[in-house]
Amino acid sequence: HQYRYNDYYLEMKKLLDKKVLGDVKLVRARQNFFARRYDWQTLLYREGGAMRNNAAHTIEQIMDLAGSDELPEIHSRMEIWNSVGDAEDYMFATMKYSNGTVYEVEVNPSDAYADGCLFDIYGTLGTMKVYSSKIQYKYFDPEECPMFALEHKSLHNPDGSPAYCTNNIKWKEETIALDPDMMNVFGKCSSRFYHDWYEHLVNGAELYMKPEHIKHQIEIFNEVERQNPLPVKFSKPE
């Protein structure tokens, strides 16, 4: 759960809280790479698999973005593509919360390019692309580009030919550079995570990541696994 302390997530959340994209309608999150795993995390009896290993971080971030510990409406798929164990290495789920926003999360072990972003975020005022090393967002000011009044009749040009909707949006684009060193990025977010634990245990600060919150995250895991039962094929060696 240290990923909630990542620079990219903190900056992304700050921008979304400012409503730079207006009302967020769709969030697509992905952890794509090419991998053929053969370690303990490919084994169900050891609680392995793409969801509990990789997607767990993203699902917790999505819960925070939604601002809710509710069990969302979930549609999911889990399969074994490249790994040698019995736990899933591919996972895809859509989660719709009561706020109306749809969240998608994917872990794909067959992406040899792996050049996509971590998050694509779509709102009524624009779009955001979130990478570990930068955030790009394109948006407009609704006061500069007011919505047109509804027209019930067919649109026509002055010469009588058919016309089509034109928005003439004045786009603004911004980029925020982040630390490109992945090992340093992981070290920073982990340090922040354990620093908060220290402050809670030693100085009585409010616990940032509460057990009740994690309990609801596990409920999401359980629902995805209920929809995608995988047979246990391996057990602990004697």
Predicted feature locations:
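Predominantly a Rossmann-like dinucleotide-binding segment in NAD(P)-dependent oxidoreductases
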Residues: Y3-G85
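Alpha-helical elements of Rossmann-like donor-binding domains used by nucleotide-donor carbohydrate transfer enzymes
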Residues: D7, E11-K14, Q61, F92, ...
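C-terminal capping/lid region of NAD(P)-dependent oxidoreductase domains
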Residues: G22-K25, R226-E238
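Glycine-rich phosphate/pyrophosphate-binding beta-alpha loops
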Residues: A56, E106-A114
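Short glycine/serine/proline-enriched coil/turn segments at secondary-structure junctions
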Residues: N82-D86, D111-A114, K129
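Active-site beta-strand termini and strand-to-loop segments that position acidic
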Residues: A93-G100, I121-G123
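C-terminal glycine/acidic-rich active-site capping loop/insertion
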Residues: L125-Y208, K233-E238
